[in-house]
């Protein structure tokens, strides 16, 4: 079982959504990224080059959220997961994109999608929701 690195609660303004008002006004998205990676070398060597740089993770994730508008947060989550999986040291990733200001007329606390990718079956392959 691999170690885990987590980036939780990254808040970035974006213009994603199907409705014109979402794209015109924008809204805050909250993103959680969990990646499974062997951190033994990083721990032993105390060297940033031996781990996944979480500053880069936050910056690239924020750039995707703030970047070109997408209709679906499923697409946004997939783009984040795919760039994380570009690093061959990563065994798997889970990306949660929260859209707490979604245009839903009923009162709600959150709406989110969870995108998971794993090396099982090849780069960027989807894995079942039951676990990594």
UniProtKB/Swiss-Prot annotation:
One Gene Ontology molecular-function label: oxidoreductase activity
Listed SUPFAM superfamilies: Tetrahydrobiopterin biosynthesis enzymes-like
UniProt keyword annotation of Lipoprotein present: no
GO annotation terms (biological process): folic acid biosynthetic process; tetrahydrofolate biosynthetic process
Database matches in InterPro entries: Dihydroneopterin_aldolase (IPR006156), FolB_dom (IPR006157), GTP-CH-I_C/QueF (IPR043133)
Residues annotated to bind substrate: 22, 54, 73-74
This enzyme's EC code(s): 4.1.2.25, 5.1.99.8, 1.13.11.81
Pathway assigned to this chain's UniProt record: Cofactor biosynthesis; tetrahydrofolate biosynthesis; 2-amino-4-hydroxy-6-hydroxymethyl-7,8-dihydropteridine diphosphate from 7,8-dihydroneopterin triphosphate: step 3/4
Similarity comment: Belongs to the DHNA family.
PANTHER family xrefs: DIHYDRONEOPTERIN ALDOLASE 1-RELATED
Its biological purpose: Catalyzes the conversion of 7,8-dihydroneopterin to 6-hydroxymethyl-7,8-dihydropterin, 7,8-dihydromonapterin and 7,8-dihydroxanthopterin, respectively, in equal quantities. After longer incubation times the only product is 6-hydroxymethyl-7,8-dihydropterin.
NCBIfam families per record: folB (TIGR00525), folB_dom (TIGR00526)
UniProt protein name: Dihydroneopterin aldolase
């Amino acid at each position: 079982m691999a170690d885990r690195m987590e980036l939780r609660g990254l808040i970035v303004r974006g213009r994603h959504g199907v409705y014109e008002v979402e794209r015109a006004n924008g809204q805050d998205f909250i993103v959680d990224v969990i990646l499974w990676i062997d951190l033994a070398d990083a721990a032993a060597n105390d060297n940033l080059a031996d781990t996944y740089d979480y500053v880069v993770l936050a910056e690239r994730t924020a750039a995707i959220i703030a970047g070109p508008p997408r209709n679906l947060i499923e697409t946004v989550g997939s783009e984040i997961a795919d760039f994380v999986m570009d690093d061959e040291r990563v065994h798997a990733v889970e990306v949660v994109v929260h859209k707490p200001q979604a245009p839903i007329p009923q009162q709600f606390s959150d709406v989110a999608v969870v995108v998971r990718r794993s090396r099982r079956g090849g780069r960027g392959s989807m894995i079942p929701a039951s676990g990594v």
